[in-house]
């Protein structure tokens, strides 16, 4: 169960939140400039083909640059293995989050990282409802991130893949 203080803090963040579209080059520049670790250990030219088909955004909370996010508006998640879907048909219209990272400085200015991430996912839940998506899917690079996702309502399905059912 989520703490009331976390719910209230994330609600306040969500109300100030907006995404600003950025190009792939701008995304790489921000990753380098702010020391984001999302692509650590990955050969940018060979190992991230999904990066080039993903929409990227700056996460803004008011006028504070909070982080970056990349997602696809449509992703047929379990097309190769429909038995992996948590519910029949769930993978047909899912929002796939390819990358998400919150700036350390934003945590100091805005609030706890968990509240910021929950605010981002609450914002995306509204987006999904408006656009007919059935779930949000994302991967967790580390167990620490996986634990944060579990705290805000994501369910682990396999390995480091998580889903949030709408």
Regions of interest found by a model, annotated:
Residues 148-154:
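Conserved active-site tyrosine of GNAT-family acetyltransferases
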